[in-house]
Amino acid sequence: MRQIDILIAGGGLAGSTTAAALGRTGHTTVLVDPHVVYPPDFRAEKLDSTQVAVLRKTGVGEAVLRAATLDGESWVARFGRLLEKRPGDQHGILYDTMVNTMRSEIPPSVDIIHAKVMDVATSADRQTVTLSSGEQISARLVVVANGLNVGLRHKLGMARRDISKTHSIMLGFDLVPAGAAFSFPALTYYGEHPSDRTAYITLFPVGAAMRANLCVYRELDDPWMKQFRDSPRETLQALMPGLAKITGAYDVPGRVHIRPADLYVTEGVEKPGVVLIGDAFSTSCPTAGTGTGKVFTDVERLCNVHIPRWLATPGMGAEKIAAFYADRVRAAYHAHSAHKAFLVRSVTIDTGFLWRARRWAAFFKRAGIGMLRELARRAGHSEPSVSTGATQRAFARTSRR
């Protein structure tokens, strides 16, 4: 039986980033995933500056940033009014491109086996891992990074606790101008009314395409979902009638991808020799935009802090594993992610006085910041003025308020 230091179960973003980071440490590492090339998968499609900062702490990821498209500037709008033009900090990249690019960063010292982890027999010293090929490998540590797949966790005696079923739904599609080119580099347009159950649509470049992510709070069997899938342009126009005042006429030329988000956390995780990261431990709401940051935080703390400590001494008991889950940096980000998931939902759809006040406060705050930035641009002549046409008129209406 082959003996190694670390086996990683799952080669999505969490597993591939972990493998790339550990491959530079000298620890004998094996990554197990059935896909030779990671297939198309509608998940995270951009990274913001905070996520990039954590990614860079892992020591890997520069290739991902080179493969991504930086937006340069992002416009913010609501009710058909341009509120703010802020510096862009988001890198657009499709999830499968991100994962496959990260895999290209895995050094040859990491052995990649195209199979599935079927079972893990744990102990306080070494773990016996059984693969779908029948091969068995002995590892000091098993990193479970297999995302939403619960079979292995159930075999390990862990349980999934649901927090919020179908907490939100993300719809992804390309948006193209039906006429003149889009005048904005990137755009976030917020939902117009709580009854629309829509947080926002964000438009951002991925290569030559303008990608759209629409975030809604509905059930999968809501007739509106089928309506959007069948007639996306008309349904989007009815949902956000003011959007075209910013974008101009648009069309949705291709397929609409739909991804519901169930919020859950895995319990009973403090087992010897096995640690969970990313969605294997808990999920996040894509509307809140914290999922990728949570993955990178898990990987950074695990690879930079805990694994070096664990491998420096004999054994791999549950007390070592517990230290990772109790890590203050990691715990703080997980708490932030969970809090933001419910905060954004309440700000979007709750109709109580305090929530209505928060929505309007955010609206006027963005408008005020936008006016100050525009005044600074005009005074310093350091940035271009707002484009002409419908966008110019929308900004002018906002500025007069």
Predicted regions and their residues:
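Beta1/beta-strand and adjacent pyrophosphate-binding region of the FAD-binding site
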Residues: 1-14
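Conserved N-terminal helical subregion
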Residues: 2, 53, 57, 64-158, ...
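Glycine-rich FAD pyrophosphate-binding loop
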Residues: 9, 23-43
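Conserved Rossmann-like nucleotide-cofactor binding loop
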Residues: 14, 37, 149
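Conserved FAD-binding catalytic core of PHBH/FMO-like flavoproteins
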Residues: 128, 145-245
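C-terminal helical "tail/cap" subdomain of flavin- and related membrane-associated enzymes
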Residues: 304-401
